[in-house]
Every structure is written in structure tokens, then in C-alpha cells.
Amino acid sequence: MCTSGQIIGSLLVLSVLEIGLGVSSVAVGAVSFSLALREHKPQLGDSSPVWSGVCFLLCGICGILCAKKKSGLVMILFSACCICGLIGGILNFQFLRAVTKKTSSLYPLHLASMSLACIGIGGCTLSSWLTCRLASYEQRRMFSEREHSLHHSHEMAEKEITDNMSNGGPQLIFNGRV
């Protein structure tokens, strides 16, 4: 069983990886798109690395935010960003696969973009899984704290009743005892 610290550490590493992939994908996509504009009329997949890079970048930023603030809303936001990153990466790969020709001068850039998309898809998948683990851990922790708090307040109520009985206060019957 992983501890919360291990999950958060892994989430931070994956988030930094996603930010790096996002920046790299945007850079490769921008170069690829500018070269595609010079060579031929732009096609649908020429700018897809930029958009998937933006999705990966947002996923990484939200992952760091999620690791710092472990609230439910931030975890939901991060999960949504991971899903957007998955969709962006898959669409990027599909568009580039349709556009890429091995004889094209853009082939190495398209291959690099597809590789970045595959790594980004894997990172988003792992990040989603880690977020679910973190949410489960936080839910158990909050339940345990609430249970401890209720037990503590029950003990305090019993103590108050016994103090009143020993101080000559009104006698109360509690669980069949005077």
C-alpha cells in the first residue's frame, strides 16, 4: 500500500513530465506547422501537435496544483485535464498518422510529435490512476478523522455527565446507571 507522500511524489514527477512533454510538443508542432506552410497548403493534422501540447501542459500544471491542494474539486479538475490530454494525444496521433508520408521532409518532425503524443498519453493515463488512488486515500483519511472526532465527542459527553453526578448536580440516568 502506497502512502500519501509516495502518491503525491509520483504525481509531481508525472506532472513535471507532462509539462515537459507539453512544451516539447508545442515547440515541435510550431516548427512542423511553419515548415508545412512553406511546403504545401496546411492540412488538418499539421497543427495538432500544438493543441495536444497545450493539453499536456494544462494537465501538468493541474497535476502540480492537485499535489499541493488535495481538495476534491482540484482532483476533479485534474482528472478532467487528464482526460483532455488523453483525447488531445490520441487525436494528434491519428491526425499525424493520416497526414504523414515517409517521403515528406516533415516525416522526422511528425515521428517526433507522434512519439511525444504516445508518452503524453501514457503519462495522462498514469496521472488519472494516481489521482484516483490519492482521492481514495484522502477519503479514508477524512473518514478516519471524522470517526475519531465523533468518538472523542462521545467520550467528552460521558465525562460531562459523570462530572455533574460527582459535583452534586442533578442525577441523570445514563444507560441504566444513576
Curated annotation (Swiss-Prot):
Its main location: cytoplasm. GO terms for biological process: negative regulation of canonical Wnt signaling pathway; negative regulation of cell growth; negative regulation of cell migration; negative regulation of cell population proliferation; positive regulation of apoptotic process. The keyword Membrane applies. It comes from the Eukaryota. It is found in: Cytoplasm; Membrane. Keywords: Cytoplasm, Membrane, Transmembrane, Transmembrane helix, Tumor suppressor. GO terms for cellular component: cytoplasm; membrane. Acts as a tumor suppressor in lung cancer. Inhibits tumor cell growth by inhibiting cell proliferation and migration and promoting cell apoptosis. Inhibits metastasis of lung cancer by suppressing beta-catenin expression in the Wnt/beta-catenin signaling pathway. This is Transmembrane protein 196.
